[in-house]
Amino acid sequence: MRILIQFTKRHPWLTNVTIYGSLFASADIVQQKLSKSPTEPIDFKQTAKVGLVGFCFHANFNFFWLRFIERTFPGSAPLNVIRKVACDQLMAAPITISAFYTGLSLLDGERDVFKNLKEKFWPTYKTGVMCWTVFQTINFSVIPPFVRTAYIGVCAFLWTTFLCYIRNRDINEVTTRLLHAVPNIRGKMAFPQDQDDNKPADK
């Protein structure tokens, strides 16, 4: 472990970008496994495209963006953490979401490379604000700067799994499924007294 940390400190760009790109590709494989039947093969061409977008753009963008924002608002003081998170969501998030949708549309050879972006940007952005505000608050508060891109890569693994899922589906279908899932989750988490309240009264 000590050797890995030393290597990361000596070669932060190589380590962080490699980890980030690999996690991007892995996220697509997980998404395919979860959404396909067990007999359907993995589309490794699609995985390669996701990994390419992650490695060429997202990994490099986040590496240099995190260094820039740390120099602009140094340290982990609460006010600076708030500034970093706000800048990240207002400036970086729209860029990375746009790059994901348009980049994959270009690699897929779609005629209208902005179609997915126009349809899914706002739902994706609003969901991302809820997730990434938490991820980045932790990142800027307690994660050492030299491993921040790798940490964001782990968070991006979860986020990219979601992005790959909704990219290949109608946004209304995804929204409907989420809305149906919420009552089911709530029902499973109901407290005993809530369940008792739903029982018919004894005659």
Swiss-Prot record:
<keyword id="KW-0472">Membrane</keyword>
<protein>
    <recommendedName>
        <fullName>Mpv17-like protein</fullName>
    </recommendedName>
</protein>
<dbReference type="GO" id="GO:0005778">
    <property type="term" value="C:peroxisomal membrane"/>
</dbReference>
<keyword id="KW-0576">Peroxisome</keyword>
<feature type="transmembrane region" description="Helical">
    <location>
        <begin position="50"/>
        <end position="69"/>
    </location>
</feature>
<keyword id="KW-0812">Transmembrane</keyword>
<feature type="transmembrane region" description="Helical">
    <location>
        <begin position="90"/>
        <end position="107"/>
    </location>
</feature>
<dbReference type="GO" id="GO:0061668">
    <property type="term" value="P:mitochondrial ribosome assembly"/>
</dbReference>
<feature type="topological domain" description="Cytoplasmic">
    <location>
        <begin position="70"/>
        <end position="89"/>
    </location>
</feature>
<dbReference type="GO" id="GO:0005739">
    <property type="term" value="C:mitochondrion"/>
</dbReference>
<dbReference type="GO" id="GO:0005737">
    <property type="term" value="C:cytoplasm"/>
</dbReference>
<feature type="transmembrane region" description="Helical">
    <location>
        <begin position="144"/>
        <end position="166"/>
    </location>
</feature>
<keyword id="KW-1133">Transmembrane helix</keyword>
<feature type="topological domain" description="Lumenal">
    <location>
        <begin position="31"/>
        <end position="49"/>
    </location>
</feature>
<feature type="topological domain" description="Cytoplasmic">
    <location>
        <begin position="167"/>
        <end position="203"/>
    </location>
</feature>
<comment type="similarity">
    <text>Belongs to the peroxisomal membrane protein PXMP2/4 family.</text>
</comment>
<dbReference type="InterPro" id="IPR007248">
    <property type="entry name" value="Mpv17_PMP22"/>
</dbReference>
<feature type="transmembrane region" description="Helical">
    <location>
        <begin position="13"/>
        <end position="30"/>
    </location>
</feature>
<comment type="function">
    <text>Participates in reactive oxygen species metabolism by up- or down-regulation of the genes of antioxidant enzymes. Protective against the mitochondrial apoptotic cascade.</text>
</comment>
<feature type="topological domain" description="Cytoplasmic">
    <location>
        <begin position="1"/>
        <end position="12"/>
    </location>
</feature>
<dbReference type="Pfam" id="PF04117">
    <property type="entry name" value="Mpv17_PMP22"/>
</dbReference>
<feature type="topological domain" description="Lumenal">
    <location>
        <begin position="108"/>
        <end position="143"/>
    </location>
</feature>
